Amino acid sequence: MAVERKFVQERLKKLMVKEWIKDEVRSAGFGGVDILRTPLGTQVTLFVERPGLVIGKGGRRIKALTEKLKDFGIENPQVSVDEVEKPEFNAQLMASLLARALERGWYFRRAGYRFLYRIMEAGAKGCEIEISGKLVSERARTEKFVAGTIVHTGDPAESMVQKGFDIAIKKLGVLGVSVRIIPPDVTLPDEFEVKDVNIEHLRGESGEDEGDKGDEQGGEAQEAEGAGA
């Protein structure tokens, strides 16, 4: 049980660190975080839309983040910041930006379709956006925006679909924003390619095969006649 408890504690600590970092770099466009333990310490890589806001003037903000991570029990944290190369294919970043737009007063339906159009125009194979909560009244509900192909079950839903989630704090309450994206470079299990076939080339190969068979049969017949003589 001690081993299982240790793994649970490590996962819980990573989750707490991720949620704290998400709140700290919210204005920079949070796109995810990788936490990797190495022999020299713990490598923490932040993926954001605007790295300059995370680094700060003279690197002061990133130094403050590094010191704060030590309070979570992370040994010798080494923080690096990477810019998200293709924001439209990063589901976590899209969820964060959509949540910030809702907090600024965007109407939920306008925001949902705007981000759906942006993601699909970038070349995504499919996108699904869900906004849940008290959208227009005291009664909570869920509004869904879908385009293209989205997989919900099986291994493809886990390995091929980018997922992101964030919250928007409104006067009526908290809205949950969920984004699922299938990038354009993903090959789905039901996709296949029909290659062009050169019919003349196949006919030529077929003729050569028949000719070879005829030569072999002729040679066998001559050998049989020679043996009979």
Swiss-Prot record:
What does it do? Answer: Binds the lower part of the 30S subunit head.
Q: How does it assemble?
A: Part of the 30S ribosomal subunit.
> Which segments constitute the KH type-2 domain?
17-85
The record's section on InterPro entries has:
KH_dom, KH_dom-like_a/b, KH_dom_type_2, KH_sf_prok-type, Ribosomal_S3_C_sf, Ribosomal_uS3_arc, Ribosomal_uS3_C, Ribosomal_uS3_euk/arc
Superkingdom: Archaea
Q: Which UniProt keywords apply?
A: Ribonucleoprotein, Ribosomal protein, RNA-binding, rRNA-binding
Similarity comment text for this entry = Belongs to the universal ribosomal protein uS3 family.
Name the Gene Ontology biological process terms: translation
GO cellular component labels: cytosolic small ribosomal subunit
What SUPFAM superfamilies does the entry give?
Prokaryotic type KH domain (KH-domain type II), Ribosomal protein S3 C-terminal domain
| Name of protein | Small ribosomal subunit protein uS3
Is Transferase there in the keyword field?
no
Q: Name one GO molecular function term.
A: structural constituent of ribosome
Composition bias, Low complexity: 219-229
